[in-house]
Each structure stands twice: as C-alpha cells, then as structure tokens.
C-alpha cells in the first residue's frame, strides 16, 4: 500500500498464468493504518486492491505509533486466513520496540526486514534475532539509495566478479545468501 502498486500486482498475478500458490506476495502496513480494529480494515482494503484472498507475508512497516495494536489485528488476520506470515520492518533488535513486539505477540515475527548490504552488513542484528527464529531480509541488497551505485562499482567486488566470470550484482547477492540473509 505504501508504494501504491497493489492494483498492478494483483492484475499481474491474475494475468501471468502462474498458480497463486506459486507466487509469494508481500506487503506492508503504513503507520497511519496501525491500531486495533483499524489495521484489520486496512488489510481488507489491501486484499481488495490486490484482488487476492490472502497475503503471504505482511509487515509492520516502521516501529512507530500503535504498532502493537496493529500486530494484534495482524494476528487476527492470520487466524482468519487472510495473511500467512507476519514480519517487522526497520526494527532494531536491540531497541525497546523490538522487545515490545516480542513481549506482546502471540504469533512471533517470521522476518525482520532491514537495510543491509556489504557496506551495511548488519551481521550483529542477524545474530540478535537468530535465537527467536527470525529470518533477516535485506532491503537495498545492492546498496542504498544514497550510494549512487557505489557498491556495484566497488573495486574489490568488481575484482571478485571478474575472477569468477560473474556480474557485481551476482557477487553481492551471493554474499547475502552465504551470510544467511534473504534477498
């Protein structure tokens, strides 16, 4: 919803010819949609825009506002079959907000989505959430918006890529996978 692409995604899913159960759909709740009661309504609207019966993974986009109330509604959506798994985005595992979710959740987050790439490795974060069984998924896996493509032009990465007959992007994505991150 935050990226205003749900209608297009829903149409693509319907038209692509691939069975729905073979497509993984992820979405995020915007902070203005947080709050017990309010979030369930937002999920229903999201599903309507997507023209789908369920979302595979739904994130709390940011740890602000009534994210605990949102989480309670997200759990209800899981129980109703509208959502399959829950995730948190932009939370820091050492912050109070992370522990607030963990202390209040009946259904624990399956995924923590954070910015990470070779310039922002976040390995400590991965280790902090590992005991909870939470997978770390990286946004900006090829480098942040402010990097202007620097990671893809990094001399060390280019040297490794050339030595292995791969592109810089392939080397970076391989690094993510070898480090145990989802991309």
PLM-predicted stretches and their roles:
Residues 7, 25, 40-41, 154-155:
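A generic alpha-helix surface/boundary motif
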Residues 21-24, 55-57, 109-110:
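Residue-level recognition of the N-termini of beta-strands and the immediately preceding loop/turn
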Residues 62-183:
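Beta/alpha (TIM)-barrel catalytic core signal, keyed to glycine-rich beta->alpha loops juxtaposed to Asp/Glu
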Residues 1-23, 53, 76, 142-144:
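N-terminal binding-site loop/beta-alpha segment at the start of enzyme catalytic domains
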Residues 4-5, 31, 42, 91-93:
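Repeated polar recognition positions within modular binding domains
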Residues 26-28, 138-139:
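Generic beta-sheet signal
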Residues 14, 32-76:
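Glycine/small-residue-rich loop that forms an oxyanion/phosphate-binding "nest" at active or ligand-binding sites
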